[in-house]
């Protein structure tokens, strides 16, 4: 990045004009002499010189003049964190040369894991969600009431995505193109597909399950509104949406299953700053209502 910026500055000093389109605010602050902000297809303001700050850009991008910068935002304290353990990792190992991982996740906590790309966090998260098998160890999840009644056990070992789903675990991938969206299906189908039940029938209107359409429509409309998803006609292909709105649909899909535990792998990838703030707010609401 630094080499690119240095080359751009050299070209500018030689008289070249450079036009950059980006949602990466830090890049604009570091490289731009003038910045125009667009919101919903409208030019909402132009900044120049010392006016190009993170706070000013965020204010124009979100329409909120009091918008706080990322460095000023602090996590909202949880209402309560229970002593009840809902997920545990026991001697979990996801890399040959990695350490064993042991931890307990109490109900009502938001646990963050970070690291540079390619340092094992993707393998770790997928092992927790039952997508990939760890090299050793196990992931234990408290079962849903339905599964506990059926198996007579409070906890179960997660060996697959189906095991996780039965125990009320929802997952959102950070790679929507490879692991998230169904590109040949509509926006609507992409969001509510986990709710389809029973034998499916193919018609000109798409896949129809045995859940009442009224209920599905209500769920779809609710998630669109609360996550501020700009969808257009819901029967349009998911690929008609911007990357950020595709990501929101994936997050909404996880919420439609009313999970007890949400595992999110880089959930804010490709989402604008205002939507990130809304997402984090909804995650806090989720845990305050009993989720983890």
What residues fall within each predicted segment?
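Glycine-rich phosphate-binding loops of nucleotide-dependent enzymes
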Residues: 1-292
């Amino acid at each position: 990045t630094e080499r690119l910026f240095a080359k751009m500055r050299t070209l500018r000093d030689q008289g070249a004009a450079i036009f950059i389109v980006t949602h990466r605010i830090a890049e604009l602050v570091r490289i731009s002499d003038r910045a125009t902000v667009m919101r919903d297809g409208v030019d909402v303001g132009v900044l120049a010189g010392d006016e190009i700050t993170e706070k000013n850009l965020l204010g124009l991008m979100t329409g909120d003049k009091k918008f706080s910068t990322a460095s000023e935002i602090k996590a909202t304290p949880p209402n309560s964190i229970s002593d009840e353990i809902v997920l545990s990792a026991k001697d979990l190992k996801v890399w040959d040369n990695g350490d064993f991982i042991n931890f307990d996740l109490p109900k009502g906590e938001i646990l963050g894991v970070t690291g540079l790309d390619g340092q094992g966090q993707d393998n770790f998260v997928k092992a927790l969600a039952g997508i990939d098998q760890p090299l050793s160890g196990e992931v234990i999840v408290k079962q849903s009431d339905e599964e506990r009644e059926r198996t007579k056990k409070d906890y179960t070992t997660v060996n697959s995505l189906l095991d996780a789903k039965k125990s009320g675990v929802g997952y959102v991938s950070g790679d929507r193109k490879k692991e998230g969206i169904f590109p040949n299906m509509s926006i609507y189908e992409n969001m509510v597909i986990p709710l389809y039940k029973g034998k499916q029938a193919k018609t000109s209107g798409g896949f129809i399950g045995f859940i009442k359409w009224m209920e599905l429509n209500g769920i779809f409309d609710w998630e669109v509104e609360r996550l501020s998803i700009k969808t257009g006609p819901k029967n349009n292909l998911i690929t008609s949406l911007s990357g950020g709105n595709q990501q929101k649909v994936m997050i909404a899909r996880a919420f439609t299953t009313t999970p007890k535990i949400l595992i999110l792998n880089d959930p804010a990838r490709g989402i604008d700053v205002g939507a990130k703030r809304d997402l984090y707010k909804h995650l806090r609401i989720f845990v305050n209502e009993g989720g983890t």
